[in-house]
């Protein structure tokens, strides 16, 4: 299982999706890092990046919310990335932690311009940044985009646990991670239940970084797995009779929040102050939050 140290390290990096396309969160920002890019696509509401002349900043304030509609912005983001590619420059997709919003646009771009399936596009971005996890609403929009581009889909949203909706490609990763965390006896018990969401791949797992395994394990601890004959309707989990008095229902599997309560708290100090000891105005850019930005 990926250690917290590795997760924290990845959050503080600008991940290279392609030589001309990077995904990052605020924790990775510094003057030195930003000097490498010709365009920064800022997806954070209330955040303004005043950059030097060589860098173009595109502000697209979008909430990391399942109801946020990204479709009006696909073309604009594609355009900026393509201009950077054709000009031998680098484009940076920036959101608070580089997990949901920026990753979603990166996946959409790969799917659109490299003619890949959604599954393969997700894996391509995940390979570069293991901690990505678009929220369910964003993933559904990616599915809709794939349907529009290819006339068919390679991923779907499933409900493997009561009240828990998740993309099947992510659930497969979660299932494998959950199996790894179980004892041998629990694995045999789980194997006896023909779960339709069981993983059959050895893909890299991204949910290690989001603590979803622990949430699922706690949910499974309150339920027992049932055998079902071949051909019977799928039965995933039912309340355990031994704990029926204390169990009110399944513990919903919650996706980790990708936005900190105060986004400014994860900004590196080096990005907020001019370290120059001279009296000259050498500061060429600054990071700031504006309450009037929505």
Swiss-Prot record:
Catalytic residues, chain numbering: 95 (phosphocysteine intermediate)
Segments traversing the membrane: none
Family from the record: Belongs to the protein-tyrosine phosphatase family. Non-receptor class dual specificity subfamily.
Protein name: Uncharacterized protein ZK757.2
Keywords tagged on the record: Hydrolase, Protein phosphatase
Region of interest: Disordered: 234-294
Domain Tyrosine-protein phosphatase: 13-151
Keyword Hydrolase on entry: yes
Database matches in PROSITE patterns: TYR_PHOSPHATASE_2 (PS50056), TYR_PHOSPHATASE_DUAL (PS50054)
Hydrolase in keyword set: yes
């Amino acid at each position: 299982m990926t250690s917290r140290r590795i997760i924290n390290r990845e959050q503080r990096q600008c991940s290279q999706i392609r030589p001309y396309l990077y995904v990052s969160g605020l924790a990775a920002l510094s003057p030195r890092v930003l000097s490498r890019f010709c365009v920064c696509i800022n997806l954070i509401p209330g955040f303004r990046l005043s950059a030097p002349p060589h860098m173009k900043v595109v502000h697209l304030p979008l909430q990391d919310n399942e109801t946020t509609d990204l479709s009006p912005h696909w073309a604009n983001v594609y355009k900026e990335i393509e201009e950077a590619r054709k000009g031998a420059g680098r484009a940076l997709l920036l959101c608070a932690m580089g997990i949901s919003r920026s990753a979603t646009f990166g996946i959409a771009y790969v799917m659109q311009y490299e003619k890949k399936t959604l599954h393969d596009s997700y894996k391509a971005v995940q390979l570069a940044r293991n901690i990505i996890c678009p929220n369910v609403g964003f993933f559904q929009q990616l599915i809709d985009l794939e349907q529009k581009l290819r006339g068919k889909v390679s991923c779907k949203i499933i409900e493997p646990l009561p009240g828990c909706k998740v993309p099947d490609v992510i659930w497969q990763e979660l299932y494998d991670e959950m199996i790894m965390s179980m004892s041998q006896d629990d694995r045999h018990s789980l194997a006896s239940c023909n779960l339709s969401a069981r993983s059959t791949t050895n893909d890299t797992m991204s949910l290690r970084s989001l603590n979803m395994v622990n949430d699922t394990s706690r949910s499974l601890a309150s339920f027992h797995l049932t055998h079902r004959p071949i051909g019977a309707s799928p039965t995933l989990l039912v309340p355990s009779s031994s704990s029926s008095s204390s169990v009110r229902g399944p513990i919903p599997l919650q996706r980790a929040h990708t936005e900190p309560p105060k986004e400014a708290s994860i900004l590196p100090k080096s990005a907020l102050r001019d370290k120059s000891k001279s009296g000259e105005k050498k500061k060429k850019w600054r990071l700031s939050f504006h309450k009037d930005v929505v």
